[in-house]
Amino acid sequence: MSSFVTNGYLPVTLEPHELTLDIKTNIRNAVYKTYLHKEISGKMAKKIEICKDVELPLGEIVNNSVVINVPCVITYAYYHVGDIVRGTLNIEDESNVTIQCGDLICKLSRDSGTVSFSDSKYCFFRNGNAYDNGSEVSAVLMEAQQGTESSFVFLANIVDS
């Protein structure tokens, strides 16, 4: 995983009942709820600091809500094709084999190996190696996929140890 820090404005939408004396708290909560640990366009905000010494730009009324661009210092995380990650092998059935790596889900394609069911548990076989469901494995990221709200998703192949 790689990361970078940038300054920017994050747009958030506030409802009329949120425009009270607690507006700073409501803005902070809206920024965190909308952006923190959410995968957007291949990157995920891991840390957000709202700049308190910068004035807020004027809000814009949109459909009976107020859109405010909030000045922030944002630490983003992202993954590259070719990165090697380590996680837990999860076999739900023959066609759904993934590796869970925190904020990353690696999907294994059918040609990555074979799934077998023996002794009341699934096993994944690749190049003569057997990997039990729930075991720790390493994988190389092959292709970025559409992510979920709070996870990156990549096609990957297990790295033989």
UniProtKB/Swiss-Prot annotation:
Gene Ontology cellular component terms for the protein in this record: DNA-directed RNA polymerase complex; virion component
UniProt keyword annotations, A-Z: DNA-directed RNA polymerase, Early protein, Nucleotidyltransferase, Transcription, Transferase, Virion
Cross-referenced InterPro entries: DNA-dir_RNA_pol_18kDa_poxviral
GO molecular function: DNA binding; DNA-directed RNA polymerase activity
EC id: 2.7.7.6
Induction annotation: Expressed in the early phase of the viral replicative cycle.
Reactions listed under catalytic activity: RNA(n) + a ribonucleoside 5'-triphosphate = RNA(n+1) + diphosphate
Main localization category: virion
GO biological process: viral transcription
First-level EC class: transferase
Name of one Pfam family that matches: Pox_RNA_pol
Intracellular or extracellular location(s): Virion
Family that this chain belongs to: Belongs to the poxviridae DNA-directed RNA polymerase 18 kDa subunit family.
Function: Part of the DNA-dependent RNA polymerase which catalyzes the transcription of viral DNA into RNA using the four ribonucleoside triphosphates as substrates. Responsible for the transcription of early, intermediate and late genes. DNA-dependent RNA polymerase associates with the early transcription factor (ETF), itself composed of OPG118 and OPG133, thereby allowing the early genes transcription. Late transcription, and probably also intermediate transcription, require newly synthesized RNA polymerase.
Self-association state and partner proteins as the record states: The DNA-dependent RNA polymerase used for intermediate and late genes expression consists of eight subunits Rpo30/OPG66, Rpo7/OPG90, Rpo22/OPG103, Rpo147/OPG105, Rpo18/OPG119, Rpo19/OPG131, Rpo132/OPG151 and Rpo35/OPG156. The same holoenzyme, with the addition of the transcription-specificity factor OPG109, is used for early gene expression.
Protein name, as recorded: DNA-directed RNA polymerase 18 kDa subunit
